[in-house]
Design a protein with these regions (language model features):
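N-terminal loops that bind phosphate or other acidic moieties
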Residues: 1-151, 155, 161, 165-434
Length: 434
């Protein structure tokens, strides 16, 4: 389909390459969805909220209570992503995977969707069903993952009932209650979570993406809320890329000089502790995630994996979102299996591809480690707006760029349709004229 899309782009009535990255985006969208000009006008953002125990080390200027407050404010469209998504007609699926402070029971829902009608198709077996093996039905690594982990990445886990029916959208004003527990542990002193908890969070994100697909959304974004999560993100980024932690520590929501030095020390110390604990398991991304991540990041990673399983284009927001995307990419790559060693990490079978092939980077974050993460994914952000808010706030703007790319593919005439002789472009097409 990508070849067909590229061929049509070459036939559109314009100088070759004159629409720049819109042309590349339209071809990539066609490859993801299997449609030349899919309907991507219905969009939603999955926002994962959780607190981080490392906050107690003084790595953030904001109190932990902000996580709860903003999670509630998402439902009222009073946050940055709330206002932007409201303006662009984008829905929010707000999920509590580990908020510390109690949220009123009346705001919670066990089923985020309004369920009526027939379900859209979405992979329900292993991700291998779409040619992208992560973990097969038999594929629990020896001595490692819990049994539930088979279903987590395959979308068939014990809690995978959500989205069994399709509907008209997510419930407005509600928070999906998938709280694993109130906040992670302090990664400076101990592992953030158990691997079982990491898998539950990944499963939640997978289910979120699958639910949104079944509800008829044509494109999704991934956002977050969790005070202290630039610290956890930086630790994961350092481990996944090998870049020294001190070189990629940023100031997050803002820090004094003393606070910044403290944050660098905490990130470096947390990485040293985790590396000692992990030993030869440092190559296992789920083990690394459990040591240094957060419930929010784990759930976001699951959403990226779920989007790929459903052939659903997914947009990355800023720094935390791009590190979660890299986490998903590492998990996906590590757990690809060979046909002769089911369940064991090995050489990828089949054609070369990456989970990042399903992703779009929305905007360049000013957070220090962003460029390292996005380059590791092989992606290029669409927008340079000086943004560094998070929440998923870059996604609604990027959605419109992607919509525009699809509109060009769908509505623009070819030279033949426009009755224009394009012979004058022959020399330009052969040479380096731009």
């Amino acid at each position: 389909m990508m070849e067909k899309a590229a061929a049509r782009q070459a036939e559109l009535a314009k100088p070759p390459g004159s629409l720049g990255r819109l042309e590349d985006i339209s071809v990539k969208i066609a490859g993801i969805t299997g449609e030349l000009a899919p309907n991507v006008t219905r969009q939603a953002i999955a926002v994962m909220s959780a607190d981080n125990g490392v906050w107690e080390e003084g790595v953030a200027c904001a109190p932990q209570s902000v996580t709860r407050a903003q999670t509630i404010n998402f439902t009222r469209r009073l946050t940055g992503v709330g206002a932007l998504s409201k303006n662009f007609g984008v829905d929010l699926l707000v999920t509590d995977v580990g908020v510390l402070d109690p949220i009123p029971d009346e705001l919670y829902t066990d089923r985020p969707e309004i369920a009526v009608g027939a379900a859209a198709e979405c992979a329900t077996g292993s991700v291998a069903a779409i040619g992208k093996a992560v973990v097969t039905e038999k594929g629990v690594p020896a001595g490692g993952k819990v049994a539930a982990g088979i279903g987590v990445l395959a979308g068939t886990g014990a809690r995978a009932g959500i989205g069994a029916r399709a509907g008209t959208g997510v419930q407005a004003g509600k928070i999906w209650n998938r709280k694993i527990r109130p906040a992670t542990n302090n990664i400076y002193k101990e592992a953030a979570m158990t691997e079982e908890e990491a898998l539950l969070a990944i499963e939640t994100g997978f289910e979120a993406a699958r639910t949104l697909k079944k509800l008829g959304y044509g494109m999704i974004g991934v956002g977050e809320m969790g005070i202290g999560n630039t610290t956890t993100s930086t630790c994961l980024l350092a481990e996944f890329t090998g870049v020294p932690a001190a070189q990629i520590v940023g100031k997050g929501g803002g820090l004094s000089s003393d606070g910044y030095e403290r944050k660098k020390a905490v990130v470096s110390g947390a990485c040293e502790r985790a590396e000692s604990e992990l030993g030869d398991r440092r190559e296992d991304p789920i083990a690394v995630l459990a040591e240094l991540g957060g419930f929010d990041i784990a759930a976001m990673a699951g959403a990226y994996i779920g989007a790929a399983a459903c052939r659903l284009p997914v947009v990355i927001d800023g720094y935390i979102s791009v590190v979660a995307a890299l986490t998903a990419d590492r998990i996906f790559d590590y757990y690809r299996v060979t046909s002769d060693v089911a369940g064991q990490p090995g050489k990828p079978a089949g054609p070369a591809f990456r989970l990042a092939d399903f992703m779009f980077a929305s905007h360049k974050s000013f957070e220090r480690g962003y460029e390292v993460a996005v380059e590791a994914l092989g992606l290029e952000p669409m927008l340079l707006l000086g943004m560094r808010l998070g929440e998923g706030s870059g996604c609604p703007i990027a959605f419109k760029v992607i919509e525009s790319a699809v509109a060009v593919m769908r509505d623009m005439a070819t030279f033949e349709e426009a009755a224009i002789n394009d012979d004058y472009l022959d020399e330009i097409r052969l040479g380096d004229s731009f």
